[in-house]
Amino acid sequence: MSDNRIYTDRDCVETGCGCSLKGKVVVLKESNLEAGFGRQLYYCTGGNGANANALGKSVFLVNLKNGEFERCVRDHVLGVLKPELMPDEEKLQLSQIRPPGALPLENHEPQYSGYSFLEDGRYAAGVWLCNEKEAMEYVEMQKPYQHRIMLCDRNDFCVWEVRDGMQIYPPQEKLDEMSEGLVKNPGPMQL
């Protein structure tokens, strides 16, 4: 269904060189479809052209149809997609992307797995996350687009859950207790 849709500036929450692209789903201009880019929707992982009012031009992307890494110039980007317009298949592909700067799995043992669910319950396989920082970055990058996000520990127990952008587990009281404990006994936090 999303294959035939042509996205325009009306489908973007931000457009132009003044918006930051990193960590967001971006729309490539329709003219780029003929220039070798077969899709309009990509996840931006960075590049010297990804910042607002960037001096550079390179933008690094992940294709939300096939998961392949690609590069374009900033001028090819129309803007940042409105989250509510993201098609389900692209949401599933986005759920498989580890946060930019994630540690390589070859020499780091994952501590968590991240899952993102569509409203109908569909999801793709979990994503390995090596530490708390990566786990929280995964939640933040998925939150605008996904219905439900769940982080599980190595034993596959849920340690964090967000639904429709709102944290539901652990409850706020538990987080308050944890933060009070950190003030009294500083040290690593366990999710």
What are these regions (language model features)?
Residues 24-37, 118-123:
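Beta-loop motif signature
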Residues 1-24, 29, 97-99:
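Mixed-charge, Lys/Arg-rich low-complexity intrinsically disordered regions
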Residues 101-124:
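Short aromatic-glycine-(Arg/Gly/Cys) micro-motifs in beta-strand/loop hairpins
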Residues 118-121, 126-153:
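A short, charged, amphipathic alpha-helix used as a generic interaction element across diverse proteins
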Residues 29-75:
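Basic/aromatic-rich interaction segments and small domains that mediate binding to polyanionic partners
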